[in-house]
Regions:
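Primary mode marks residue(s) on the alpha4-beta5-alpha5 output face of response regulator receiver
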Residues: 37-69, 76-187
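Sec/Tat signal peptide C-region and signal peptidase I cleavage site
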Residues: 32-36
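N-terminal secretory signal peptides that target proteins for export/translocation
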Residues: 1-13
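Bacterial N-terminal signal peptides
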Residues: 19-29
Length: 187
């Protein structure tokens, strides 16, 4: 009897919220058209110096993320967000993004971003742009040998401005972003 790998299990668990995210993706399609094309554009984005990546690293994968930032009310403020998102590329859905922060590809690779990230607020109505150092990239595929991850061109995703109704109240706030994954170049 064949057993499921952790990647297969994660993708199965994702199926519960995937339809919602696909709906969000369709709504975000017009916003995505104004941004770089993930399928063909592996140029590094123009970013503030606080989140720039050194020149000895090059973009090897660029995906468009659509999902939610999940906040929980602790009685006095909204707690740190946990993402649930999918990443799109020319071939369609290529990866999922979840707590860690972790990205897991259909090709079998996984990368976790080191916390805390370098962050800069570009749009006061959206979650910050980030640069994360990659830790523990695993498996063959698009996230293999990743050194840095950037989240840029963000829309939405900010914690609600109103207080939660009760301790434990959960708010799922839609967001979109471009994600750039870097590898070190050999010189």
């Amino acid at each position: 009897m064949k057993t499921k790998t952790s990647l297969q299990i994660q993708w199965i668990q994702t199926s519960a919220w995937l339809p919602t995210l696909v709906g969000l993706a369709l709504g975000a399609a017009s916003a995505a058209s104004a941004l770089a094309e993930p399928a063909t554009d592996n140029r590094a984005p123009e970013v503030p110096t606080e989140i720039a990546v050194s020149n000895d690293n090059k973009v090897h994968f660029h995906g468009f993320g659509v999902g939610v930032q999940i906040y929980t009310w602790n009685g006095s403020s909204w707690g740190t967000a946990v993402p649930e998102a999918i990443l799109f590329h020319a071939e369609g859905v290529v990866a999922i993004h979840f707590a860690g922060p972790t990205w897991q590809s259909k090709s079998g690779s996984t990368v976790v971003g080191a916390l805390p990230p370098k962050a800069v607020t570009v749009d006061p109505n959206a979650i910050p742009w980030l640069r994360l150092d990659a830790k523990s990239p695993e498996g063959p595929g698009i996230f293999a040998n990743t050194t840095f991850i950037q989240r840029v061109n963000t829309t939405g995703g900010k914690a609600p401005s109103a207080d939660g109704a009760f301790v434990g109240h959960v708010a799922r706030v839609p967001y979109t972003a471009d994600y750039f994954f870097y590898r070190q170049t050999s010189n």
